[in-house]
Regions:
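AAA+ P-loop NTPase domains with strong preference for DNA replication initiators
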Residues: 1-132
Length: 132
């Protein structure tokens, strides 16, 4: 409860307005709309370079850390209807990226790895749909 009050007080002092956007900005978490856009690009963008550029530009514009993006995406992808083997592989690749980030690996390299993991997941889903 104290943490919530501290967050609300900090948000009010910084922005003089307490909204979802200002709270997320104050605590440094990516906003839901940003994560939705990133997940949309990861699931639907066929051009790897374009996907990388979209996400990288958003990260720079909003000051987002890839580790925070990974955490938020992890929460959401459990709601996506992936086949179990695809979801397991995707979660393993995401956890590997998070571990490499924690050990000091480049965010650009790990962003590319994250995009590659989703491209791989999409290919496995398409192959599974074709063979079913």
């Amino acid at each position: 409860m104290r943490r919530v009050l501290n967050t609300l007080q900090s948000t009010w002092l910084a922005y003089r307005d307490v909204t979802e956007r200002t709270v997320y900005t104050c605590v440094g978490h990516p906003q839901r709309a940003d994560i939705s856009a990133i997940l949309n690009w990861l699931l639907n963008e066929n051009d790897f370079a374009a996907c990388f550029k979209h996400i990288q530009d958003l990260k720079i514009a909003k000051g987002l850390a890839l580790n925070d993006i990974l955490t938020e995406i992890h929460t959401i992808i459990h709601r996506v209807k992936f086949p179990p083997e695809v979801l397991i592989t995707l979660l393993i690749k995401m956890s590997d990226s998070e571990a490499r980030l924690a050990s000091g690996c480049s965010e650009r390299i790990e962003l590319a790895a994250l995009i590659a993991a989703f491209v791989d997941a999409r290919e496995h889903i398409n192959v599974a749909e074709l063979t079913a």
